[in-house]
Amino acid sequence: MASQWTIPKLVTWRVRDWASCFLACKIPLDGDEDGANNNGNTTNNNNLTFKRIKRKIKSTKKKRSERKLSLSPPGTRHHHLHLRSSSVSPTTSGSQHRRLSWPQPPVSEESGFIVFCFDREDGGFDVVKEGKQEKKETESSSEKSPRTVNRKLIYGDQGVGGTEKNNSPETKGTEQDQNDNTSCQGTKDVSSDVTERTKEEEDIDASDKSSGSSHSDEGRGSFAFPILGVEWMGSPAKMPESDDLSPKKQKPVALGFQCCRF
């Protein structure tokens, strides 16, 4: 039985067959394009999923490394950070190299400078300071020379100190005067010491001559009293005393002593 839809179906089939005769590649090409589009969509989806998986893996690795660093002792953290810094991508290192290789501004030639001269035999050193103003002065007057400062190191008990001395005739004259004064004071002190020593020696000689007693050592067995003209053996308990030591006023004294031997 024929229905109302059979006629249009037959018409459509006949049109397709007729078109397929003239355009044999048209229909399969449409089908291939649809398949290629489907395949492209699937590949894009696969790429997106693969990228997402990569990102997740990287994030998990970073989290694990951070946990290890937090749990590791402080001595090893520096080592891990050094390894991370060494494993920087070459692109970043190239950019840093480019930044470093940029042309730097030239140093101004008008800036001042200091020159140290250590060729002195006194142990000191000269300091030459030159700046913009001094350069202008030297250009204006060639006779003027840069300021020189002599600094001499003095090593004392408390520490090391530096004394600044300007090379001028006034300072040299004052230094010579000070040295002369110190030398004069030293000679005066030495002469006074010598005179005091000679006076002490003269006093000792006078006392020895007046007493006339010769002090013997303990190891010897006898000693003498020249005033009394008596020689004892051993050491007496008490020294005899004489009233007048002058030879004119001496009176003959007769005393009897007993010799004692120990």
Swiss-Prot record:
- Tell me what effect the entry lists for residue 235 to A: Abrogated MPK3/MPK6-mediated phosphorylation and abnormal nuclear retention associated with impaired cortical polar accumulation. Reduced interaction with YDA and fails to induce polarization
Outcome of residue 87 to A?
Answer: Reduced ASK7-mediated phosphorylation
Q: How does it sit in the membrane?
A: Peripheral membrane protein
Modified after translation how? Cortical localization of BASL requires phosphorylation mediated by MPK3 and MPK6. Phosphorylation promotes YDA binding. Phosphorylation status modulates subcellular mobility.
Residue ranges with Basic and acidic residues bias: 129-146, 190-200
Q: Where is the composition biased (Basic residues)?
A: 51-66
Q: What is this protein called?
A: Protein BREAKING OF ASYMMETRY IN THE STOMATAL LINEAGE
Native species: Arabidopsis thaliana (Mouse-ear cress)
The upper taxonomy is:
Eukaryota, Viridiplantae, Streptophyta, Embryophyta, Tracheophyta
